[in-house]
């Protein structure tokens, strides 16, 4: 009987971002504009870093991977959301929901760990400059990338396995525009207290610890560069401030969503929209606009291949 109950729910009905047609149209247009303008910019960042021999430092290697992660992350939720805006009934299969949830946490977890790696890179570059070539050699950089991909995979697998073990026998309406843990787990027809604790530990605690660790590391870096020369200080300050902005934009919504009991709050959908759609598109752009070397290289690539 338990096995049958687990297979009763074969699809979920997404209630969407809002029931207002005017707001749906506005969000549809804004997200579409973001896609057509900023998403190609992310791929331009990747192409620029790959094609310019002058951008071989570990910072640019990680920035290229960040752009790739964000471009991939933006394909998980936004395209389906745009299609659903045009549909009267928004339905996602059980398997499709689990797949979306897996990639959401796989790429999101990997990106959070990548920001930790980038903070470590900046710490070594600014606080231990003489050791930088030795510590941040290509082999170490590739090992770090492999570790963060593996970390994101393990984090996501834990989320998915916990969901798959739950029976779903109705109702099947998800009060959101995509599948995520807080909404899906509430539809399980069993007590989920222990599972929620495990998920808060897996997602929320990891997010919070990474956030606090990143803030502490950049605080150390900022204290260290106070006595530097004016030019070096300004460049280091610019890089650190950019990273801190991205940290708040990424981890702020994550902490709000995953470090509390899985209850519905009025701001949930707006925070989720920013976290899953807007921020992944803007993230590499924020880095690029404050990096003179990347901007100069992008101009050369643009003039060479397009102008």
UniProtKB/Swiss-Prot annotation:
Glycans are attached at residue 5. InterPro entries: GPCR_Rhodpsn, GPCR_Rhodpsn_7TM, Olfact_rcpt, Olfactory_Receptors. Residues 50-57, 121-139, 220-235, 290-307 are cytoplasmic. It comes from the Eukaryota. Keywords: Cell membrane, Disulfide bond, G-protein coupled receptor, Glycoprotein, Membrane, Olfaction, Receptor, Sensory transduction, Transducer, Transmembrane, Transmembrane helix. The gene is OR4N2. The keyword Cell membrane applies. The chain crosses the membrane at residues 26-49, 58-79, 101-120, 140-158, 196-219, 236-258, 270-289. It is a multi-pass membrane protein. Odorant receptor. It is found in: Cell membrane. This is Olfactory receptor 4N2. It comes from Homo sapiens (Human). One of its GO terms (cellular component) is plasma membrane. It holds the Pfam family 7tm_4. Residues 1-25, 80-100, 159-195, 259-269 are extracellular. The lineage of its organism: Eukaryota, Metazoa, Chordata, Craniata, Vertebrata. Disulfide bonds join 97-189.
């Amino acid at each position: 009987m338990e096995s049958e109950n687990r297979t009763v729910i074969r699809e979920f009905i997404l209630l969407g971002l809002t029931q207002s047609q005017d707001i749906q149209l506005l969000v549809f247009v804004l997200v579409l504009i973001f896609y057509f303008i900023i998403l190609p910019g992310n791929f331009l960042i990747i192409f620029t870093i790959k094609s310019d021999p002058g951008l071989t430092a570990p910072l640019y290697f990680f920035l290229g991977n960040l752009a790739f992660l964000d471009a991939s992350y933006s394909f998980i939720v936004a395209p389906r959301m745009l299609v659903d805006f045009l549909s009267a009934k928004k339905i996602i299969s059980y398997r499709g929901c689990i797949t979306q949830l897996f990639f959401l946490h796989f790429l999101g977890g990997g990106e959070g760990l990548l920001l930790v790696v980038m903070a470590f890179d900046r710490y070594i570059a600014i606080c231990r400059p003489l050791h930088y070539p030795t510590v941040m050699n290509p082999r170490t950089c590739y090992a770090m990338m492999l570790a963060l991909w593996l970390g994101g995979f393990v984090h996501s697998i834990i989320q998915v396995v916990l969901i798959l073990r739950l029976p779903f026998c109705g109702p099947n309406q998800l009060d959101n525009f995509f599948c995520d843990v807080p909404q899906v787990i509430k539809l399980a027809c069993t007590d989920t207290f222990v599972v929620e604790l495990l998920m808060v530990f897996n997602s929320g605690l990891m997010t919070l610890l990474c956030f606090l660790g990143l803030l502490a590391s950049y605080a150390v870096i900022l204290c260290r560069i106070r006595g530097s020369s004016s030019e070096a200080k300004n460049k280091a300050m610019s890089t650190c401030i950019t990273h801190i902005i991205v940290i708040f934009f990424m981890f702020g919504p994550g902490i709000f969503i995953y470090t509390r009991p899985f209850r519905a709050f009025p701001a949930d959908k707006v925070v989720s929209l920013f976290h899953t759609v807007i921020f992944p598109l803007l993230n590499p752009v924020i880095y690029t606009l404050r990096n003179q070397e990347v901007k100069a290289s992008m101009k050369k690539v643009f003039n060479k291949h397009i102008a």
